[in-house]
Structures are given as structure tokens and as C-alpha cells.
Regions:
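Positively charged, solvent-exposed patches that mediate nucleic-acid binding
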Residues: 1-120
């Protein structure tokens, strides 16, 4: 079954109650300047949230980081074998400019590690 490489509303995690639950009960992992909180989901498919705090730079910088993260999620979400609620966030400004290759590689590595962890 081929999964469409889009980022529709169905895969977005946007209810504050659900996001709070992920932050309270989820597992934390650091991907360099990107933080991730995740937990197994009761939903059929994985859902994602992207958040960048104001401390992470100017509005254009924050928007670029969000755009890069959403694009990486869109391209790589088909790698996930199980349903998760995942929150990606950036709390502080990166020490170096993030490029699309770096973000894509980190998201791919995270999804592969998540699959290994859940299959054990």
C-alpha cells in the first residue's frame, strides 16, 4: 500500500489536551537543536505537531524551521510502522543554520530508531 506524501489535517496533532498528554507522558529525545516528545497513539495513524518558540530567532527563522520540519515529516512519515503521537519542537536558537538535508536526515534517523525500538 502506497502512502501519499502529503501533510493533511488528519496527521496533524492539534488538540491542546492531546499535546499536553504527549508532553506529560511521552518519551523525550534530542535531535541536536530539535527536541522530540512521543508516545504510542490510540489513533490509526501517526499524528505530528511542530512547535518553535520565540527564543529560536526571528519570525522568518522560526517559519523556515517549521517549514523544514513539516517537509521532512511529510517525506518520511511512511517509514513509521506503528501509530505515534509525535511533537517536534525547537526551544532555543540553533548554533548553526539548519538546512533541509540535515533536518531530513535527523527525522529519518528518528523514525528508523522508533521502528527498531517498537519491534523489540
Amino acid at each position: 500500500m502506497s502512502m501519499r506524501r502529503t501533510f493533511p489535517k488528519a496527521v496533524r496533532l492539534h488538540h491542546s489536551r492531546t499535546i499536553r498528554e504527549v508532553f506529560e507522558k511521552g518519551v523525550y529525545l534530542s535531535l541536536g537543536p530539535i527536541g522530540v516528545k512521543y508516545k504510542m497513539a490510540e489513533a490509526e495513524s501517526s499524528r505530528f505537531s511542530v512547535s518553535v518558540k520565540k527564543k529560536a530567532g526571528s519570525a522568518t527563522c522560526r517559519n523556515r524551521i517549521k517549514r523544514l520540519l513539516r517537509e521532512a515529516i511529510r517525506q518520511e512519515r511512511s517509514l513509521l510502522n506503528y501509530a505515534y503521537d509525535i511533537c517536534f519542537f525547537v526551544a532555543s536558537p540553533p548554533k548553526y543554520p539548519l538546512d533541509s538535508f540535515y533536518v531530513l536526515r535527523q527525522v529519518r534517523r528518528f523514525f528508523n530508531n522508533l521502528n527498531k525500538e517498537s519491534s523489540e
